[in-house]
Regions:
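Catalytic Walker B motif of ABC-type/P-loop ATPase nucleotide-binding domains
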Residues: 12-15
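ABC ATPase nucleotide-binding domains
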Residues: 84-124
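H-loop/switch region of ABC-family ATPase nucleotide-binding domains
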Residues: 47-48
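Conserved ABC ATPase "signature" C-loop
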Residues: 65-66
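Helix N-cap at the start of a conserved alpha-helix in ABC-type nucleotide-binding domains
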Residues: 23-25
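A short, surface-exposed alpha-helical micro-motif characterized by mixed small hydrophobic
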Residues: 53-55
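ABC ATPase "signature
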Residues: 71-72
Length: 124
């Protein structure tokens, strides 16, 4: 990725960037992507890793058979468990965990959101 960043492209396409990365590598990748985004560059990322997608993406498109079957802000797309499962994907881990609690008005989809919600629930 570093050799591409040096070329300063307006658009960067990453295909399954978390493939074969350990958790530390994923964290490093998130830092690199944050660096790229801070420079107002466009990123197109193809991934099956919904936890990764939840942490870094603003807008999500769900593709199945080359067709867009879902799109929108990542919060609405990644918490639509039926849509994702219907197309062979899993919701982010925190969304699946908190969905089991039931009775929540809004499911978290990012780890930070889950931590904030957990703190709020504990305080009540």
């Amino acid at each position: 990725i570093a050799s591409i960043i040096v070329m300063d492209p307006d658009i960067l396409v990453l295909d399954e960037p978390t493939s074969n990365l350990d958790p530390r590598g994923v964290d490093d990748l998130i830092e690199i992507i944050s660096y790229i985004r801070a420079r107002n560059k466009t990123l197109v990322i193809a991934t099956h890793d919904m936890d990764f997608a939840a942490e870094i993406l603003e807008r999500c498109y769900i593709l199945d058979g080359g067709r867009i079957v879902g799109e929108g802000g990542c919060e609405s797309v990644l918490t639509d468990m039926n849509l994702l499962e219907q197309h062979g994907l899993k919701s982010p881990t925190v969304t699946r965990i908190f969905s089991k609690l039931g009775g929540l008005e809004r499911l978290p989809f990012r780890l930070k959101d889950a931590v904030d919600l957990f703190k709020k629930l504990r305080g009540q």
